[in-house]
């Protein structure tokens, strides 16, 4: 079974690492890593996997690699 989730990312945040639910029900993920060389994407993938209690290998970034809005595919 696969699902997808769209998240809003706040890279370089002093508030992170943190996952919040925004006012419209969207996930907002704060990470300390900068948006350079995929560091923030890796941190978001790890944090999302931990938050959803899934292995990192089951969380794949499918779109939004250079955007603050990212879509992940979740395999259960």
From Swiss-Prot:
Gene Ontology, cellular component aspect: cytoplasm
Coiled coil: none
UniProt record similarity statement: Belongs to the UPF0235 family.
Protein's UniProt name: UPF0235 protein MRA_1997
Organism this protein belongs to: Mycobacterium tuberculosis (strain ATCC 25177 / H37Ra)
